[in-house]
Amino acid sequence: MIGRLRGVLIEKQAPEVLIDVNGVGYELQMPLTSFYELPELNQPTTVYTHFVVREDAQLLYGFITKQERSLFRLLIKANGVGPKLALTILSGMTASEFVGCVERDDIVTLVKLPGVGKKTAERLLVEMRDKLKSLMEASVGSEREFVLQSNYSPAPVVNSAEEDAISALISLGYKPPQASKAVSAAFKEGMDSETLIKAALKSML
């Protein structure tokens, strides 16, 4: 089991990152809420991980805090929710926003996420209510608890920010026309791909 990685961030293109740990490169997938908090390339970083072994692949999922990882682990235990959908949920909203949806029985917001239908949303609200309560109690005293206060600083604008943003949204489960429309509507001159992804996601919720 790989529970944490500390190394140098050498590649990042949402939602995937590559971290060099003593000469070994680890590929991870991260929810965008965690991805936004990564440092610039070639800077040291620490991420908490969840390791998934399948017949055809071994996958690492990365998170900035233990609480975010704990929520991911609760999500994948819910009926009908696998790692991919859990990653999509935590990319579409922060952990605190998800907790708020559960507390308010907010199905309307949940079903706007790709891959989350009405039945899945209803199951999540029922199954997660008690689990989230205990998780939040356990996180009391944590530096950030469930509030994600990003210290993200946009990287210099790169070529094809729109293409990168569309690609990231498609990888999260959005259909290409839907992703393209959202990115085009959210794009403003000077935006880097990460800021554009965040704006496009916000416009769809």
Curated annotation (Swiss-Prot):
Pfam families: HHH_5 (PF14520), RuvA_C (PF07499), RuvA_N (PF01330)
Segments of this protein annotated with the region Domain I: 1-64
Task of the protein: The RuvA-RuvB-RuvC complex processes Holliday junction (HJ) DNA during genetic recombination and DNA repair, while the RuvA-RuvB complex plays an important role in the rescue of blocked DNA replication forks via replication fork reversal (RFR). RuvA specifically binds to HJ cruciform DNA, conferring on it an open structure. The RuvB hexamer acts as an ATP-dependent pump, pulling dsDNA into and through the RuvAB complex. HJ branch migration allows RuvC to scan DNA until it finds its consensus sequence, where it cleaves and resolves the cruciform DNA.
Region Domain II, residue ranges: 65-143
InterPro entries: DNA_helicase_Holl-junc_RuvA_I, Hlx-hairpin-Hlx_DNA-bd_motif, NA-bd_OB-fold, RuvA, RuvA_2-like, RuvA_C, RuvA_C_sf
Complex and partners: Homotetramer. Forms an RuvA(8)-RuvB(12)-Holliday junction (HJ) complex. HJ DNA is sandwiched between 2 RuvA tetramers; dsDNA enters through RuvA and exits via RuvB. An RuvB hexamer assembles on each DNA strand where it exits the tetramer. Each RuvB hexamer is contacted by two RuvA subunits (via domain III) on 2 adjacent RuvB subunits; this complex drives branch migration. In the full resolvosome a probable DNA-RuvA(4)-RuvB(12)-RuvC(2) complex forms which resolves the HJ.
GO biological process, one term: SOS response
SUPFAM superfamilies from the UniProt entry: DNA helicase RuvA subunit, C-terminal domain, Nucleic acid-binding proteins, RuvA domain 2-like
UniProt keyword Ligase, yes or no: no
Gene3D superfamilies: 5' to 3' exonuclease, C-terminal subdomain (1.10.150.20), DNA helicase RuvA subunit, C-terminal domain (1.10.8.10), Nucleic acid-binding proteins (2.40.50.140)
Keyword line: Cytoplasm, DNA damage, DNA recombination, DNA repair, DNA-binding
Record-level Gene Ontology MF annotations: ATP binding; four-way junction DNA binding; four-way junction helicase activity
Record-level GO cellular component terms: cytoplasm; Holliday junction helicase complex; Holliday junction resolvase complex
Protein name: Holliday junction branch migration complex subunit RuvA
Span list, region Flexible linker: 144-156
Origin superkingdom: Bacteria
